[in-house]
From Swiss-Prot:
It is found in: Endoplasmic reticulum membrane; Cell projection, Dendrite. It catalyses: a very-long-chain acyl-CoA + malonyl-CoA + H(+) = a very-long-chain 3-oxoacyl-CoA + CO2 + CoA; (6Z,9Z,12Z)-octadecatrienoyl-CoA + malonyl-CoA + H(+) = (8Z,11Z,14Z)-3-oxoeicosatrienoyl-CoA + CO2 + CoA; (9Z,12Z,15Z)-octadecatrienoyl-CoA + malonyl-CoA + H(+) = (11Z,14Z,17Z)-3-oxoeicosatrienoyl-CoA + CO2 + CoA; (9Z)-hexadecenoyl-CoA + malonyl-CoA + H(+) = 3-oxo-(11Z)-octadecenoyl-CoA + CO2 + CoA. The lineage of its organism: Eukaryota, Metazoa, Chordata, Craniata, Vertebrata. This is Very long chain fatty acid elongase 5. Its main location: endoplasmic reticulum. One of its GO terms (molecular function) is fatty acid elongase activity. InterPro entries: ELO_fam, ELOVL5. Pathway: Lipid metabolism; polyunsaturated fatty acid biosynthesis. The gene is ELOVL5. It comes from the Eukaryota.
Length: 294
């Protein structure tokens, strides 16, 4: 195992240059193998989990879902607040910010972005809850792609560019996740569920996030400041893939199916959330349920 870690580290260092010494020794960051292992385990569970649950009753998980989603809401709120205040403290430049001129603000950003990276590991639980509740229609290519790529991308970000221009996407995403996880936490409470109205706007906000992140990243290409351009080009490319996938989800879910869902008497005016309405699965309405995009 140690030999494999050394070979991977040598290969990455030869490709990408020296790592940022400020994160040396941090949990999960010194070696890529733990992150890769978590990813492989995640993909295996995605593949095997639905098979295991095929002939079993769905698990409600309602109480756990409330706690889980509210915990991620609070974590996202903390990360958003810390990033905004740290960026303000360091006088970060919106158009381009290097990784070493922010002083103590850079250290604050690095600390928060480690939590952001770690939160992507926690968010694997989103998929596991879908499997336990037999909401397999929500385990889409978009959902899986978004989850496993974010964890791996942010391992590399944290090792080579853990502050500076890397802050923007994480800040905006943390804000969106405050809205998203609060929605899904509240939607697990039957008495509150009928009053939730902002799910559609979460997807719109995610699309705005990707577009603005791509624009902000492009600014650093046009007006360089020393932030590695290879990272900028990769970020732009990744944002394009997310814009395409999320746009397709939005069109399929809200444009083409919106009219049909309104006419479906089985919903009785209450939208299905995560495959449940009033806390009970209604498997007869699979075709009309909306998938999460996170």
């Amino acid at each position: 195992m140690e030999i494999l870690n050394q070979r991977l580290n040598q290969q990455f260092d030869s490709w990408m240059g020296p790592r940022d010494p400020r994160v040396r020794g941090w949990l999960l960051l010194d070696n890529y193998l733990p992150t890769l292992s978590f990813t492989i385990i995640y993909l295996l569970i995605v593949w095997m989990g639905p098979k295991y649950m095929r002939n079993r009753q769905p698990v409600s998980c309602r109480g756990i879902l409330v706690v889980y989603n509210m915990a991620l809401t609070l974590l996202s709120l903390y990360m958003f607040y810390e990033l905004v205040t740290a960026v303000w403290q360091g006088g970060y430049n919106f158009f381009c910010q290097d990784t070493h001129s922010g002083g103590e603000a850079d250290n604050r950003v690095i600390n928060v972005l480690w939590w952001y990276y770690f939160s992507k590991l926690i968010e694997f639980m989103d998929t596991f809850f879908f499997i336990l509740r037999k909401n397999n229609h929500q385990i889409t290519f978009l959902h899986i792609y978004h989850h496993f790529t974010m964890l791996n991308i942010w391992w590399f970000v944290m090792n080579w560019v853990p502050c500076g221009h890397s802050y923007f996407g994480a800040t905006f995403n943390s804000f969106i996740h405050v809205l998203m996880y609060s929605y899904y936490g509240l939607s697990a409470i039957p008495a509150i569920q009928p009053y939730l109205w902002w799910k559609k706007y979460i997807t719109q906000g995610q699309l705005v996030q990707f577009v603005l992140t791509m624009i902000q990243t492009s600014c650093a290409v046009v007006w360089p400041c020393g932030f590695p351009k290879g990272w900028l080009y990769f970020q732009i490319s990744y944002m394009i893939t997310l814009i395409i996938l999320f746009s397709n989800f939005y069109i399929q879910t809200y444009k083409k199916k919106g009219t049909a869902a309104k006419k479906d008497p089985r919903h009785n005016g209450i939208k299905s959330v995560n495959g449940h309405s009033n806390g009970a699965s209604h498997t007869n309405a699979v075709k009309n349920r909306k998938a999460r995009t996170d």
